[in-house]
Amino acid sequence: MARFNRKVMPHWRSGFEEEVAAFLKIHQNKVRYEKLKIEWIDLAYRKYTPDFLLDNGIIIETKGRFVASDRRKHLEIKRQHPELDIRFVFTNSNAKLYKGSKSNYEQWCNKHNFKSAHRVIPMEWLKERGKPIKDKIVYVKKRVKV
């Protein structure tokens, strides 16, 4: 019986993540997909896995829908890990936060000091100087009993 040796490609959670990965494959040394875990505290210790990690240490989160629970989670992570540079790439940055909302995803990001982009990672983000993240897990600095 013949065996086939083929490279196993990562399993993308969406077509949009696959598009971003293809873009990064061209413009980065290595595509780091879900390679980092960030510990954060809610009512318990939780771990968040961002989508992509750039060579310069910038964390990219790709989003189709940006629901209230994700927004709250990212505000908490930013509060607990101010040293991390988390940025969003939306399929539609002009989408409203919820039905009837006056603000959209991009406005929410601006209000809360997150950088965001529409569909494509800007080349400026790839060229920015930064500090690469070498750890696989970023822990909360001060652990408390929950």
Residue ranges and their predicted role:
Residues 1-146:
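Nucleic-acid endo/exonuclease domains
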